[in-house]
């Protein structure tokens, strides 16, 4: 089923530059290539939904960054890593078949609202005030 307002949506791919990919029904995935940090932040501020799949269990920051910018983010589980509880903007899938991703993306897009209320989700990640609290303990032990 196609999104009723699909003609209003722009579909972008950030990262490695690639040719545009025709998606059907007059829509294409447009590559914007690698973005500066400022361009990346601006793009996230203007984005409602995104897909960022992990290909290793190592830290994968794009889905985290997208979700704290209030982007409804689809990602995947990988081995023992599951971001589903990171915040309410994260959708973490065990099954990343194209049909399953499309189904979840359609659900997200059907819930689209022009104004997305900002909620400071996962403030420990966002504010990052006490990252190295353990250093004082190490100093005391070694002291």
What residues fall within each predicted segment?
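A charged, aromatic-enriched C-terminal amphipathic alpha-helix characteristic of glycosyltransferases
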Residues: 95-96, 110-143
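Short acidic alpha-helix that forms the nucleotide-activated donor recognition element
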Residues: 36-47, 68
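Active-site donor-binding acidic/aromatic loop of nucleotide-activated sugar
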Residues: 26-36
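Short hydrophobic beta-strand element within catalytic cores of glycosyltransferases
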Residues: 71-76
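Nucleotide-sugar-dependent
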Residues: 53-63, 68, 82-84
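Conserved catalytic-core segment of nucleotide-activated headgroup transferases in glycan assembly
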Residues: 1-26
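Acidic donor-binding loop of glycosyltransferase active sites
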Residues: 42-58
